[in-house]
Structures are given as C-alpha cells and as structure tokens.
Amino acid sequence: MGGNGMDRIIDIYEMMKNVRRISFQAKSLEGSSTGWNYVGKGNVVVREEEDRLYFIEEIILDNDIRYSDRKLWEFKENYIGFYRFRNGDYEKIFEFLFCDGEFMMKKEYLCSPDLYYGEMKIWDNRICLLIKVKGEKKNEVLEYTYLT
C-alpha cells in the first residue's frame, strides 16, 4: 500500500469499489433509550461516479427486518468524505484525514441534539466504519464492516 496520503486514498478507492458485502451491528449503551440492538448482514451495490462511490446497501437484521441504506464516499486529495442519505439528499457527516498512517475524523458531526463521532479502520479486505452517537436519549455504537 502507498505511503503518502494521496496514494493511500487511491488504494482505498480501489478497494472500496470492490465492496460487495456488509455486516452491521448496533448497540445501545448505558443511558440510551433507543433500544438499538441489532446485528445484520447483507449486500452492497457500488456505483462509481468520478471521485465518488455510492453504496446501496440491503441488510437483513437478526429479527428478519430488511434495512436499506445509501451512503456516499467522496475521495479527495487529502481526505475521504462520508455522506449519509437523508430526506432525499446526501448529507456530509465526516471527513477522514490521513494522518500518521491512519484515517482520523476531522471533526464530530452535530445533528441536534445528538453528536456523532466516526472512526474508519482499513484491513486487507475489510473496511470498518464505526459511528458513536451521543445525546440526551442516545448512547449508541453503530458498526458497518464492508467486505470485498
């Protein structure tokens, strides 16, 4: 894998365009009132458009509920942008900067009254997106693991 940030971002783009599967886990932690405790697996369809990869996800949760989601990954010279699809459009949540050999969240995301924190970990054939949500009624960890 490349050593500098741009090389690493290109490597991740090449890897992510081959993602086909997802495993998902949601956990409610102490103080949460949401009851988000799910595990699921599913498939991902990836659509390429210039410096963007659109993920169309179909997940079957452990309670047999189907869950569909869409995400957008934007690959820039010095960061990877992460967007979620909400209210009919893509909304930027995080920018992950390449720093000291790993991707670091530039800043947390506020969706009042909740604050979102993100982590992105890369292994040989897996990408893990970890999102922590904290607020008055929420204390959740959402883990998306993408597999090629």
Q: How should each PLM-predicted stretch be described?
A:
Residues 5-145:
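Soluble ligand-binding/transfer domains with enclosed cavities or grooves
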